């Protein structure tokens, strides 16, 4: 049966990738359909109730700078906010928020339901319609066919999902949800490389059975940060504490005693789990010399008694889970509300994707989220936004867009995936970026909002706030450069009290701010120098740009040097065995990866600078030298 309307973009799946994809396509004016197996689980936080963190917070800010929903929903649902690495430089500072699951999901649903051009329909998708190498629609489990020239697939852990608790297992997309078995079989018929990955979640504990008095209280930051560039402290709900406790030798003995019934250590699970979010079984095995591991006791919300014990993700049998939980200080009487489990699922090799997240073999078909081998809400949301905007661009007959590695962590993410692929769940860290000083949380809007406006992603309200902020920064920088202090100025005595060395020659306010011992706020308190900027985010931007100007310029020079051949296009149909001079190893790797640009080719392991030179000569001889936009 054919649905009576035709759409521009269909998004399959309503998790963090799917919601951002659907919102992006709709914001760009495309008639968009979001297909979900259950409207009540749109935007659901399936694992930990938190958004942000090192590397991840940077992605959230970038989603926000491009008009996405994740940061806004976090401000409305965050019950504890912290700035991680606050004592370190601005490049690695990151915002993290503990979120109320119910409030977060409710805000996402509210945003979806009020988005023009977006239709939501509840039905699981069983099939894709592909004709002549191009996707033209999707078919639901009741045989209802929807037509669209672009489809974004964001199936999360649902493709062939199998849940494991001890040696027992059953099919499931996550606890309480059916898997997408028919769709998984359909995708395996396509000429795409497929693998299996695994992730897991800890048991949920009833807070009424926990003794918090013997744990270490962890409060949020004061003053509170906000997640969105258009966020406001008044949006935050009540703020509460988290707590910290630890495993012990008894805990570890219990876990070791249960490993013979662990699906991971008995060969039942074949999928590879996340390296940077290991199960407690993995921790005990890999770090056998440690007699204790930290556990963060995180509330799941303001109106629930469920607690998320971050750090004891497990798929051990339920009886072992009870023992290990009750061996932990403060949880001796704990009751488990939901058992922990592991889930195995299909993912598709992201090397089969373009940087736009469109598949290289099926035109109009885009993948985003865990289907690409990533882990985390933030990584999924960022990919969803990129896939959604590129699906819209394709429908509109426009050229695809993806940020470069020097423009955004999103650029690092998609370049890593499409160039190198992954054999384990991929998590974003600041260490993955070469140009961290340029890719800070605080300047995500300055890096991306103008591009978002050009693409049609950024609404008038956000654009006005951004424009006002950008203008105020520029005007303040001009003022600091133009206002001078002479040695005999009346402010010098006051200044010398905070300077490490007395002022001996005239200096501009910018020169003074460049000194490591001077903060912007301190400078503005000197008589005649203020009042300065009222917006603390704009003031922070002025300070960072002045103090790090030399380092920033150095990184920009490095980028300009690297860009000479970075964006030189490589034909996707190029047979590298026909390029004379390449070694067999390089030929095999290039034919397997099919890089889109010289820059991507150069980052493939084993592709030498000499091989890159050979490629450039070959392209020049064939008249194929051209740059991407």
Curated annotation (Swiss-Prot):
Its main location: cytoplasm. This is tRNA uridine 5-carboxymethylaminomethyl modification enzyme MnmG. It holds the Pfam family GIDA. Homodimer. Heterotetramer of two MnmE and two MnmG subunits. Its cofactor is FAD. Gene3D superfamilies: FAD/NAD(P)-binding domain (3.50.50.60), GidA associated domain, C-terminal subdomain (1.10.150.570), tRNA uridine 5-carboxymethylaminomethyl modification enzyme MnmG/GidA (1.10.10.1800). InterPro entries: FAD/NAD-bd_sf, GIDA_C_N, MnmG, MnmG-rel, MnmG-rel_CS, MnmG_C, MnmG_C_subdom, MnmG_C_subdom_sf. FAD binds at residues 13-18. HAMAP family: MnmG_GidA. Belongs to the MnmG family. The keyword Nucleotide-binding does not apply. GO terms for molecular function: flavin adenine dinucleotide binding. NAD(+) binds at residues 273-287. It is found in: Cytoplasm. Keywords: Cytoplasm, FAD, Flavoprotein, NAD, tRNA processing. NAD-binding protein involved in the addition of a carboxymethylaminomethyl (cmnm) group at the wobble position (U34) of certain tRNAs, forming tRNA-cmnm(5)s(2)U34. It comes from Shewanella amazonensis (strain ATCC BAA-1098 / SB2B). GO terms for cellular component: cytosol.
């Amino acid at each position: 049966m054919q649905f009576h309307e035709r759409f521009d973009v269909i998004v399959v799946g309503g998790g963090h990738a799917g919601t951002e994809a659907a919102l992006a396509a709709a914001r760009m004016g495309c008639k968009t359909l979001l297909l979900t197996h259950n409207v009540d689980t749109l935007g659901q936080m399936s694992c930990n109730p938190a958004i942000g963190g090192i590397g991840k917070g940077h992605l959230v800010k970038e989603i926000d700078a491009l008009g996405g929903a994740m940061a806004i929903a976090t401000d409305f649902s965050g019950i504890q906010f912290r700035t991680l690495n606050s004592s370190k430089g601005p490049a690695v500072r990151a915002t993290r928020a503990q979120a109320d699951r119910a409030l977060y999901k409710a805000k996402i649903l509210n945003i979806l339901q009020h988005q023009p051009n977006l239709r939501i329909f509840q039905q699981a998708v069983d099939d894709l319609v592909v004709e002549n190498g191009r996707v033209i629609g999707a078919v639901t489990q009741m045989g209802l066919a929807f037509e669209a020239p672009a489809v974004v697939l964001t199936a999360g852990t649902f493709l062939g999902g199998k849940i494991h608790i001890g040696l027992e297992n059953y099919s499931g997309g996550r606890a309480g949800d059916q898997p997408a078995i028919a769709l998984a079989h359909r995708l395996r018929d396509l000429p795409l490389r497929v693998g299996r990955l695994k992730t897991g979640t800890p048991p949920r504990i009833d807070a009424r059975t926990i003794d918090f008095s013997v744990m270490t209280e962890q409060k949020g930051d004061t003053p509170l940060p906000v997640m969105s560039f258009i966020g406001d402290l008044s949006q935050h709900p009540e703020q509460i504490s988290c707590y910290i406790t630890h495993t012990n030798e008894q805990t570890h003995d219990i876990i070791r005693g249960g490993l013979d019934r662990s699906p991971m250590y008995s060969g039942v699970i074949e999928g590879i789990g996340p390296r940077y979010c290991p199960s407690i079984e993995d921790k005990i095995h890999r770090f056998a010399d440690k007699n204790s591991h930290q556990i963060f006791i995180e509330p799941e919300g303001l109106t629930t008694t469920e607690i998320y014990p971050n750090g004891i993700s497990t798929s051990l049998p339920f009886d072992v889970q009870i023992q290990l939980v009750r061996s932990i200080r403060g949880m001796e009487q704990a009751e488990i509300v939901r058992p922990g489990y592991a889930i195995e699922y299909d993912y598709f090799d992201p090397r089969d994707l373009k940087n736009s997240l469109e598949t290289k073999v099926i035109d109009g078909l885009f993948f985003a989220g865990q289907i690409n081998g990533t882990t985390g809400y933030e990584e999924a949301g960022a990919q969803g936004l990129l896939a959604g905007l590129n699906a819209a661009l394709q429908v509109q007959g426009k050229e695809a867009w993806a940020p470069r590695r020097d423009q955004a962590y999103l650029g690092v993410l998609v370049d890593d995936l499409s160039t190198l692929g992954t054999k384990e769940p991929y998590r974003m860290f600041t260490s993955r970026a070469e140009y961290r000083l340029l890719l800070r949380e605080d300047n995500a809007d300055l890096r991306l909002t103008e591009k978002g406006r050009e693409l049609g992603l950024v609404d008038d309200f956000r654009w006005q706030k951004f424009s006002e902020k950008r203008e105020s920064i520029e005007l303040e920088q001009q003022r600091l450069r133009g206002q001078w202090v002479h040695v005999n100025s009346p402010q010098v005595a006051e200044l010398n009290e905070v300077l490490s060395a007395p002022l001996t020659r005239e200096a501009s306010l910018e020169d003074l701010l460049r000194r490591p011992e001077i903060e912007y706020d301190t400078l503005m308190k000197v008589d005649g120098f203020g009042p300065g900027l009222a917006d603390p985010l704009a003031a922070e931007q002025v300070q960072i740009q002045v103090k790090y100007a030399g380092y920033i310029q150095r990184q920009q020079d490095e980028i300009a040097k690297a860009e000479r051949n970075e964006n030189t296009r490589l034909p996707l149909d190029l047979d590298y065995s026909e390029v004379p001079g390449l070694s067999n190893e390089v030929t095999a790797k290039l034919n397997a990866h099919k890089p889109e640009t010289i820059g991507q080719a150069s980052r493939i392991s084993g592709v030498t600078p000499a091989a890159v030179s050979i490629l450039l000569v070959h392209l020049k001889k064939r008249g194929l030298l051209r740059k991407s936009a």
